[in-house]
A protein has these predicted regions:
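Short, positively charged and aromatic/hydrophobic N-terminal segments
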Residues: 25-28
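N-terminal secretory targeting signals
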Residues: 34, 38-58
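Short alpha-helical hairpin
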Residues: 62-77, 128-133
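Divalent metal-dependent catalytic cores for phosphoryl transfer on phosphate-bearing substrates
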Residues: 79-84, 92, 101, 105-228
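Long, amphipathic alpha-helical surface segments
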Residues: 225-237
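Charged phosphate-binding loop/patch that engages nucleotide di/tri-phosphates or the phosphate backbone
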Residues: 239-263
Length: 263
């Protein structure tokens, strides 16, 4: 085979160079005696050189060192998430899975379901809004005009569909937790609360007002912690002249009423 020099160069940079860089990263981690992190990086085929270099991704993987993801499908899911999400969003998803599972253990919930919902909760977050809208309309997921107008809101509903169709998730409890993780709803289950709350307090979250107070409350009461979290969301949204979805407003009112009646 007569290959030109340019062909060889292109093959090197397209095929061999990424492998070499990835191998270098693994070797570097081993040299730094971060054996656990090296194993974590190698255990997920979808984590390429760029992701392995990302500090947030490394931090998220470090959370999973002592207790890896339990679902046997997790490596495949992680590979799909790595390919479809931005690095920060990917790291956030791993961190929410860790946090959801932890809170589930604390509050006597199903840790596997919590992990699954936490891992997949943002699986549609990086889709373009017009694609989210197309999926929502084509599959009759919602006719709420306020949801349809905002990717920040719509990705949860579409994410539940994507989790079922693309990731093979069939558990209705998990799919429901994904559907409502960003708005909540009156009467939501404790698993729903666990995932919704974990989304806002996972370890990689940048500091915001009352974050540490919410984290502390989450150790003893999902309801009180979620109420404080949603009230903070309401303050943040309204202070910027933006729209707070009625479902969130109703969830806040429901939590206040429930906590008052429980006294």
């Amino acid at each position: 085979m007569n290959m030109k020099k340019q062909d060889i160069i292109e093959i090197f940079f397209e095929k061999l160079f990424p492998v070499a860089v990835f191998s270098f990263i693994i070797v570097s981690l081993v040299i730094q005696e971060d054996i656990s992190l090296a194993k974590q990086v190698m255990s997920f085929p979808g984590i390429d050189a760029d992701l392995a270099c990302n500090k947030q991704v490394q931090e998220a993987l470090s959370l999973l060192e002592s207790e890896p993801l339990h679902d046997p499908r997790a490596p495949r899911w992680v590979g799909k998430l790595a390919a479809s999400l931005k690095p920060g969003r990917f790291a956030h998803s791993l961190s929410v899975a860790w946090m959801s599972r932890r809170l589930a253990h604390v509050h006597g919930l199903d840790p596997l379901k919590a992990e699954q919902a936490g891992l997949l909760h943002d699986c549609a977050k990086c889709l373009p809004l017009d694609e989210m809208q197309r999926i929502a309309v084509d599959h009759s997921l919602t006719d709420d005009p306020e949801l349809l107008a905002s990717g920040a809101l719509l990705h949860s509903v579409v994410g539940s569909w994507v989790a079922r169709e693309d990731y093979g998730m069939t558990d209705p409890d998990v799919l429901e937790a994904i559907s409502y993780h960003n708005t909540g709803y009156p009467g939501m289950t404790r698993l729903d609360m666990c995932v919704c709350l974990s989304d806002s307090i996972e370890p990689l979250r940048e500091a915001y007002p009352r974050l540490e107070q919410i984290r502390a409350l989450a150790e003893t009461s999902l309801e009180r912690a979620l109420l404080l979290s949603l009230e903070g969301t309401a303050d943040f949204v309204t202070s910027r002249g933006k729209f707070l979805h009625p479902r969130t407003q109703n969830t806040i009112a429901w939590l206040k009423r429930s906590l008052s009646e429980a006294r």
